[in-house]
Amino acid sequence: VAQPIIIIKENQALVELTTRDLSFINERNLSRIFHEVAEAGLEIHLMQTSAVTFSMVVDHKPERITHLEKTLSQEFIYEEKTSLRLITVRHATPAMLERFRAEHAIWFEQTSDVTTKLLVLASEE
């Protein structure tokens, strides 16, 4: 049985981009978003796509995030939430995940086979 590994990234930002005309997020939209993320020198730590919204978690680097807002706000409704912490747990036990969920208000959660990522307010302990 693998031992749990916990990685905590402080000072994270959640950026949500919603199509202005409520059309679906498609490959063209994603290509544009990824291009601007690369131009800004940001790395996406967590992402999710819904029908009309693309959400991503990046390091909160104001000058770089401002670039995203300036370049993407014409095409998308831009929303940003800061003061967040990203907790990544590999090989978590069910009890460990329950404890994290009980101790934090979860803004965003993503689970794969062996990894769970939880986005929480940084002020929470």
Positions of PLM-derived features:
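A conserved regulatory-domain signal marking ACT and ACT-like small-molecule sensing domains
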Residues: 1-125
